[in-house]
Amino acid sequence: MRSSHQICASITDICNVKNGHRDRQLLLGNGFDVIESSENWAFGYSLKDGYKGYVKEIDLEPFESKTHWIKSLGTHAYIEPNIKSTDQIFLPFGSQINVISKAKKFVKTKHGFIPEQHTLPIGSYLSDAVQVATKFLGAPYLWGGNSINGIDCSGLIQAACLACGMKCPGDSDLQELFFPEVKGPWCKGQLIFWKGHVALTISDTELIHANATAMSVTIEEIKATLSSIDAAGDGPVTHRSQI
């Protein structure tokens, strides 16, 4: 029987099988509907994008409504409304929380006190997906990653889109199918797809992407990236979209 849960860990993996490799990640407060459970693993799907897989049962708790989400790259929940007090848990960008009350410049949650300036109400969004993506500049590359601790190409695109109120699948192949194709000259806010990879243009000459060459999120010239990917045998471009 299906049951609604949410993530109670800072970050958890969605795996292809029990004890399998990481396909994607979910963040604190993200909803996850459980279809079945066995051997300490729950099979189900993410509420933000429908992504299916296995999550450790220990990282799940019953679903509850949330009031705010984390808009900073990351933040901490403190035991008191004081930056010098003990921090209890790290909340990555995109985590969701339920604010109980406000105290000084903090919001009180069951996780502890979080700096209010790092939060936005649920239903309020950022306005520039490119600007969001550049927040992650220098973040380490991690296959299937969805946070500042480690992120991959499609995770970066999804984080930028969801933060701006746009729906976005989790993997690059699904993103390619989801976003309509465009043609014409390069401009800011275009998604460039290759087989198994995606990047986002930040201008008519540069793009940002999480890549395994640099093992981080980098900004590069569009022409240079097109040439290097083609030279590596992973070209050509298969699709372009505007977000």
Per-range role (PLM):
Residues 30, 95, 189-190:
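Structural motif
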Residues 1-19, 25-28, 35-38, 45-48, ...:
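SH3-family beta-barrel domains
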Residues 94-95, 114-115, 127, 134:
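Glycine- and small hydrophobic-enriched segments that form the cores of compact globular domains
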Residues 166-223:
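...with weaker cross-activation on analogous glycine-rich loops/strands in unrelated enzymes
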Residues 45-62, 107-121, 200-215:
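Short, compositionally biased
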Residues 140-147:
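Second-shell loop/turn segments in exported
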Residues 133, 147-164, 169:
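Active-site nucleophilic cysteine motif
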Residues 214-243:
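Hydrophilic extracytoplasmic domains
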